[in-house]
Structures are given as structure tokens and as C-alpha cells.
């Protein structure tokens, strides 16, 4: 089970006082956090006794995305989604059952920095805190992390 109270608190603190310190504090916590990324598995996958998916080459994984319709310049841009915990995931899913994988910041970065990447970033808790990380911001975070 994923519980990210420290990250959720940092997101709230940033929303209340959005400055470079609150942003950096939230990013530092994000870098250590595990997130839930909603997926569609086709055909449906079974689970083992520990709740892990049993996948084979026949399974196709599709990551859920959202569009930022408020972005009038780029309304067709899609973003991956991430959730701090199952409560945030359930709020977004409106009671529907949703499969999810565990991911971290680096997993999102790998998907976003592929040469053929379609998504332009990822959104954390779109039904709650709604923190957007465009690909350019992801690149800056990686440079900061790597000391470049």
C-alpha cells in the first residue's frame, strides 16, 4: 500500500505559499516517493497471492493520460497521471475499478524523455492537488538531481 502523507503535506504547503523553497521541498520529497500510475491491461491480468499482476507477452499495457484543456495554446497535449495514494486514485476514478502500477519520478522521466514520447509531462493528483510537471520541468529536476 502506498501512503505519501509527507508528499501530500508538501503539496498543500506549496499550494498555500508557492515559492521556490516550497517547490523544492515538494520536489525533494517527490524524488523519494512511490506513486500510483493508472493503467489499462488488455486482456485483463490475473494476480498472484501478493496482489502482483501476472503478465505475459500477450498483455498490452496502456497508461492513462489527461489533457489540459485550459492550455489554449496546446489543448491536444496529453499528460501521464500519478497519484500519491489509493484515495486520490479512487477520487479521480469516480468509483470505477482502476488498475495501477507503482512508479517513481524516474519511471515518469524515462517515459517522457524517449525520442518518440507523445505525452508532454505528468500530473500528480489531478482530482486533488493537481501539480503539473511538464517535460521541461522534469528535465530541470533531473539536472538539479544530477548536479549538472
Task: Please annotate each region the language model reported.
Residues 1-148:
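An interfacial alpha-helical scaffold signature
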Amino acid at each position: 500500500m502506498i501512503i505519501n502523507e509527507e508528499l501530500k503535506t508538501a503539496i498543500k504547503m506549496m499550494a498555500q505559499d508557492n515559492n521556490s523553497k516550497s517547490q523544492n521541498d515538494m520536489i525533494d520529497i517527490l524524488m523519494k516517493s512511490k506513486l500510483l500510475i493508472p493503467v489499462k491491461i488488455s486482456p485483463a491480468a490475473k494476480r498472484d497471492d501478493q496482489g502482483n499482476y501476472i503478465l505475459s507477452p500477450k498483455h498490452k499495457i496502456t497508461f492513462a493520460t489527461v489533457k489540459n484543456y485550459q492550455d489554449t495554446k496546446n489543448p491536444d497535449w496529453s499528460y501521464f497521471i500519478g497519484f500519491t495514494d489509493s484515495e486520490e486514485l479512487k477520487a479521480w476514478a469516480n468509483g470505477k475499478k482502476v488498475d495501477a502500477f507503482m512508479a517513481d519520478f524516474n519511471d515518469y522521466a524515462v517515459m517522457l524523455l524517449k525520442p518518440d514520447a507523445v505525452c508532454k509531462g505528468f500530473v500528480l493528483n489531478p482530482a486533488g492537488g493537481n501539480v503539473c510537471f511538464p517535460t521541461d520541468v522534469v528535465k530541470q529536476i533531473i539536472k538539479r538531481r544530477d548536479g549538472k
